[in-house]
Design a protein with these regions (language model features):
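One-carbon transfer enzymes
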Residues: 1-183, 244, 254-261
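An anion-binding loop in the catalytic cleft
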Residues: 162-261
Length: 261
């Protein structure tokens, strides 16, 4: 059975419904709520969470979005034992994957969802084989990795203010935000609110990772490694070029950004 309560701590019937199942273990994925101690203590094989980051980096509600916004080159999935803390539990299994430059939050979430399913299929037989007993002993038998607080980052909930694009930032920062907030990044043009869906940073050193059209534009509007940005004739956020069938080139603090959708 699958339960998706809106506020698990405010729905007393949930605890009773779960207890009546007599389940050996509980598995939580993309739930976004902390289980109360009364529920954590119910299943004899523990409560387990499939989390979309390489813990302790990006504990919290938005690990996929923040890994893109902050420009992480890799992310992954971990299966961890749940505790009262927010994503603080020891990790049983973990897999890392690279993040593509042009990958958005929806695409990355789909890849991580598939990986989560694969990892849980691997983890559950191990959890079953370790058997019931005091939590500390069970986890020791499983050989879990205790999370370090070093390198911990928190993936806070995103707000409407986060969605607004600041064109005075770098091309990469703007592009990462559009990808991470997909489909929610916004800007304005002549008093109209626009939603930005697809961008490419016109950075020369990244030409191999860009589309052919963007790589060609990067030769004109990008910067080579070590090259300082020349003073823009137009201020950040201004349109530099409109390319039919491709998109709009927009000025930033350095290299330009190609807005495709």
């Amino acid at each position: 059975p699958v339960f998706t309560p809106e506020r698990i701590r405010r729905e007393p019937d949930c605890q009773q419904q779960l207890a009546q199942l007599g389940a050996d273990a509980y598995v939580v994925v993309a739930f976004g709520q902390i289980l109360p101690p009364e529920i954590l203590q119910q299943p004899p094989l523990g409560c387990w969470n499939g989390h979309g980051s390489l813990l302790p980096r990006w504990r919290g509600a938005g690990p996929i979005q923040w890994s893109l916004i902050e420009g992480d080159s890799t992310t992954g999935v971990g299966v961890m034992a749940m505790e009262e803390g927010l994503d603080t539990g020891p990790v049983l299994l973990e897999r890392a994957i690279p993040i593509g430059l042009l990958e958005n939050a929806h695409q990355l979430a789909e890849r991580l969802a598939g990986l989560t399913g694969t990892l849980l299929v691997e983890a559950l037989p191990l959890i079953e084989a370790a058997g019931p007993g005091p939590e500390a002993e069970r986890l020791q038998r499983l050989g879990v990795r205790v999370q370090s607080e070093e390198g911990m980052t928190y993936a806070r909930m995103l707000t409407k203010e986060d969605a607004q694009i600041d064109w005075s930032q770098s091309a990469l920062s703007i592009h990462r935000k559009v990808m991470g907030l997909y489909p929610g990044a916004t800007s304005s043009w002549q008093g109209k609110r626009l939603k930005l869906l697809v961008t490419e940073p016109l950075v020369k050193r990244l030409a191999a990772e860009l589309s052919p059209e963007a790589a060609e534009l990067a030769a004109r509007w990008g910067l080579a490694p070590g090259e300082n940005p020349a003073p823009q004739k137009k201020q950040a956020g201004s349109v530099l070029e409109v390319v039919s069938g491709v998109g709009v080139v927009v000025a930033t603090s350095g290299c330009a950004v190609l807005v495709r959708e």
